[in-house]
Design a protein with these regions (language model features):
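Alpha-helical transmembrane segments of multi-pass membrane proteins
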Residues: 1-275
Length: 275
């Protein structure tokens, strides 16, 4: 209440002091509520996945309000706080991006509930941030530095998230210890299959829609899969299985390359005729 009263008193003063106070106000509150929720989760003996969800939930809520209900965050300054919208959103997404990347490397247990891919607290939180990020990239408040890279950033984040979901599925369903999951043969084979599916989808969709960038991304991912088969999976699969995997890869690339040829390059502007 004292904080609200202070903001109301600063409303009439205007200027940078009032905006800075309200800016800090909307950073303090998600921190306080998130820490309180984490403390409750610890004393309730909830697993780490729940604790992370409760820690980040207030930040996600504040970020969503900044995208869809800005007037709620702008009060009591109202229009005077509008110049801070882009900076506040950038701060929110910057902090959440660091937490998101860190959370990809956590086991993310959902106890006492069973772990289900995507439908678990940690990955639902990660997915929520991806959705908010997609919405942010379509707004005018997106920093100019990020605008040329928004498609690549979203694609890279989606790829990392799907890879993380795959590794977590191996960890829980194949009973592979999380610290050594990347060195496990089942995990590496699973990544090969998932990456191949993503590469084929990129190939096909890029060809059907005439999006050369998407088609090239699929082709690059399939090249990564080939390198992975040569350097990693062959040792895990053995000679016979390794040879079979190469044959299957070659047939897959041949069929997909025939059905989904490269889209034409973008037409270059015609040269002006010289007099």
């Amino acid at each position: 209440m004292l904080g609200v009263r202070s903001l109301l008193c600063l409303r009439d003063s205007g200027g940078g002091v009032a905006r800075a106070a309200q800016f800090v106000w909307w950073l303090v509150w998600p921190s306080v509520v998130g820490l309180l929720c984490t403390w409750i989760a610890l004393h309730s003996e909830l697993a780490a996945g729940w604790r992370w969800m409760l820690l980040l939930a207030p930040w996600l809520l504040a970020t969503a309000l900044s995208l869809w209900r800005w007037n709620w965050l702008a009060a009591p300054l109202g229009a005077a706080f509008a110049p801070c919208r882009s900076a506040l959103q950038s701060t929110y997404f910057g902090l959440l991006a660091v937490a998101w990347l860190y959370s990809l490397g956590l086991p993310g247990s959902s106890a006492p509930l069973p772990w289900v891919p995507v439908l678990n607290p940690l990955e639902l939180t990660q997915l929520a941030l991806l959705v908010l990020g997609m919405r942010w990239t379509r707004t005018a408040e997106l920093p100019a530095l990020l605008r040329p890279w928004r498609t690549q950033l979203l694609a890279g984040a989606g790829f990392l998230w799907i890879t993380s979901v795959t590794l977590h599925a191996v960890h829980y369903w194949a009973a592979v210890p999380w610290p050594g999951v990347l060195g496990n043969g089942v995990a590496q084979t699973s990544l090969t299959v998932v990456w191949s599916v993503l590469g084929v989808l990129g190939w096909v969709l890029g060809s059907r829609r005439g999006q050369r960038g998407l088609w090239l991304a699929g082709a690059v991912l399939m090249a990564v899969v080939l390198g992975k088969l040569l350097l990693v999976d062959r040792g895990n699969l053995g000679n016979v299985a390794g040879i079979a995997s190469f044959i299957a890869y070659g047939l897959l690339c041949t069929v997909v390359g025939y059905l989904a040829p490269a889209p034409p390059r973008a037409a270059e502007p015609a040269e002006e005729a010289t007099p």
